[in-house]
Amino acid sequence: MEPAAGGPGPLIVNNKQPQPPPPPPPATAQPPPGAPRAGAGLLPGGKAREFNRNQRKDSEGYSESPDLEFEYADTDKWAAELSELYSYTEGPEFLMNRKCFEEDFRIHVTDKKWTELDTNQHRTHAMRLLDGLEVTAREKRLKVARAILYVAQGTFGECSSEAEVQSWMRYNIFLLLEVGTFNALVELLNMEIDNSAACSSAVRKPAISLADSTDLRVLLNIMYLIVETVHQECEGDKAEWRTMRQTFRAELGSPLYNSEPFAIMLFGMVTKFCSGHAPHFPMKKVLLLLWKTVLCTLGGFEELQSMKAEKRSILGLPPLPEDSIKVIRNMRAASPPASASDLIEQQQKRGRREHKALIKQDNLDAFNERDPYKADDSREEEEENDDDNSLEGETFPLERDEVMPPPLQHPQTDRLTCPKGLPWAPKVREKDIEMFLESSRSKFIGYTLGSDTNTVVGLPRPIHESIKTLKQHKYTSIAEVQAQMEEEYLRSPLSGGEEEVEQVPAETLYQGLLPSLPQYMIALLKILLAAAPTSKAKTDSINILADVLPEEMPTTVLQSMKLGVDVNRHKEVIVKAISAVLLLLLKHFKLNHVYQFEYMAQHLVFANCIPLILKFFNQNIMSYITAKNSISVLDYPHCVVHELPELTAESLEAGDSNQFCWRNLFSCINLLRILNKLTKWKHSRTMMLVVFKSAPILKRALKVKQAMMQLYVLKLLKVQTKYLGRQWRKSNMKTMSAIYQKVRHRLNDDWAYGNDLDARPWDFQAEECALRANIERFNARRYDRAHSNPDFLPVDNCLQSVLGQRVDLPEDFQMNYDLWLEREVFSKPISWEELLQ
């Protein structure tokens, strides 16, 4: 559905916000009025203009793309995560919630405010509100739910600052959790999901708006606030709050809701929405709640790292060579220097120029700090070619000057310090050592020994040293051990014994997802496609704007601008939630069991996740990351504490003062990490990256000067360099240098050359089918008890016990028993002689 349908006002829903003008140069660089420009008198008019243009281009290139001060974490700041729950269209509902609470509160308490009551009075009133949720009248129930939402929002009408609202919010939410609000809300949510009248009404409606999902939105808002607030740990938390947090996390991940974890109920809402049976579901809130539920029950990335270290010690594996989270946090965005071959190539292209003015040291500094990935805007289209256009448009010192001045002595700064070594310890797989020994034996001795990695008889001394070095850096992953154990279980099902499956939250969640996991993945990717900024509005695509569009479309340009910002923000939040959910599930399933991860990953690949993510990045990614789709004065809790100023076009366009949008950069990094997870060690999927021409798309993403994002882009480029041809590698030496500098080295990995054994013809179907067979065997062995191999089931040989077993016959069979007896027994002749023989 077109967002602008039904309203006369033009709706602005693009991501291209007006950019602020570039900052003026420093005051010291400005000549007084009438004074000649530096160097202008030394060059002819045309050359002077070109020199100044090159200077300006260099300085602008540096000022436009500074290093982004972004710290990757599980979530954004608490206040930001709260504000993203509400769309700006929901603004008037804050006062409705307050009104519903105060009307009910004044009946029972006449002379005091909520903030003036003691804990017992708070608990009494909270339980009274909870009882009100059990009334049958929908309108009364909605009023009580709004009153509870107001309490969860921090009773902001009695607070004077945002900090006070947040403080009361934490207190109120732990109070609501203590009296059992969450379980009552789950029952109500279940009832709303099964509300066939609301579903059929929404299906018949031509245009769905905010009003169609009021009940669901109120319930989901309260539940999200509870999950998000309880999950956030604060230093001043009471001891009982910490205990409640642990209990809540355990309950949320346990199969207590319809014999399934709570996340499965939310996944069911996603699939029901995508199937078209419930188009009124507020999908942004469902996805945000799903993300925070998965995060709360399974744990974040730092918790995952500690779980990984613990699991390695249980399996008897050596500890991890480094903490990847800390290494990435200490990395800086890549600005590799131009190599000699690049400079020579540029000189050959441009030819020797005439004598030029001497270059100041500050220009050299600007050159040193230039972003090597920044290409001219006019060359955006040329990046589809194999040339490294990041080099074009840069004016190198050796070209501009024949007489270089002696460098000035600058004090040592952080940017001039060079790293002492590569950030990552190299790794070697057992398979790599086997391949190296196989090739060495066939070369020097003329025979092979299979998977024997210890016998080195007859091999020269340098080969011995090489093997020693390889074994020093040998890394055995948890996934390899799990795959070997699975092979053992399948090879010897009787002697292997019964597998002990620890019921951790990830295992419980996987068991709940298993029956419908393909549908869940397809539904999430459908919504991701609809929310991507590159997707065009189609009549057959799903409408994800049901919980942002008002009942009456805007009539003024200002209202249209506000709604346009709201719609773009809404889509960005959806992308953020889906990318985070997928990444968390992939990482936790991989730790729990590699075949759980492979099952989910394969269904993502089958649902076209790889081209979808590449399509997402096939846009101006810098514009997406710096988009200002937010109106800070309308963000919660600012909007409920301060008086709202009159909105103008300028205030709408201004956005916030940050140099980037946290949620968009977070989403981009998550999607790159998902792409890495799907393609790592998968030859056929790596070839998909090559076939879909991902290299120029990924190279454009390197313009974002953020170390973590660059690292995952470089990883994706590294795995496909051997297939891109010699000319691409030759033309992209800066990118190759950055890969060498930033990405972990695998000894014996000829990633920079095309002569690797893996650079072979690929058969996508054969590789995926072999993997699928392993996954199906794993799922059948561990989860499909009904279809176990009958040869391995215990046999009851006792006649007494077999005859004594109670068989439950269906009721209709019992009623027509005589008919069955006549047709199946008496009417068929029995050859007793044959039977007795």
From Swiss-Prot:
Task: Indicate where this protein resides in the cell.
Answer: Cytoplasm
Give the main localization category.
cytoplasm
Give UniProt keywords alphabetically: Acetylation, Cytoplasm, Phosphoprotein
Can you quote a single GO CC term? Answer: cytosol
Instruction: Locate the compositionally biased regions of type Acidic residues.
Output: 378-391
List the residue ranges of the region (Disordered): 1-66, 333-423
What GO terms are given for molecular function?
Answer: protein-macromolecule adaptor activity
Instruction: Kindly state a single biological-process term from the GO annotations of this entry.
Output: regulation of cell morphogenesis
Q: Which Pfam families match?
A: DUF3402, N1221
Question: Which family does the similarity line name?
Answer: Belongs to the STRIP family.
Role this protein plays: Plays a role in the regulation of cell morphology and cytoskeletal organization. Required in the cortical actin filament dynamics and cell shape. Part of the striatin-interacting phosphatase and kinase (STRIPAK) complexes. STRIPAK complexes have critical roles in protein (de)phosphorylation and are regulators of multiple signaling pathways including Hippo, MAPK, nuclear receptor and cytoskeleton remodeling. Different types of STRIPAK complexes are involved in a variety of biological processes such as cell growth, differentiation, apoptosis, metabolism and immune regulation.
Quaternary arrangement and interactors, per the entry? Part of the core of STRIPAK complexes composed of PP2A catalytic and scaffolding subunits, the striatins (PP2A regulatory subunits), the striatin-associated proteins MOB4, STRIP1 and STRIP2, PDCD10 and members of the STE20 kinases, such as STK24 and STK26. The STRIPAK complex can be extended by adapter proteins such as SLMAP:SIKE1, CTTNBP2 or CTTNBP2NL. Interacts with CDC42BPB. Interacts with CTTNBP2NL.
Q: What is this protein called?
A: Striatin-interacting protein 1
Q: Which gene encodes it?
A: STRIP1
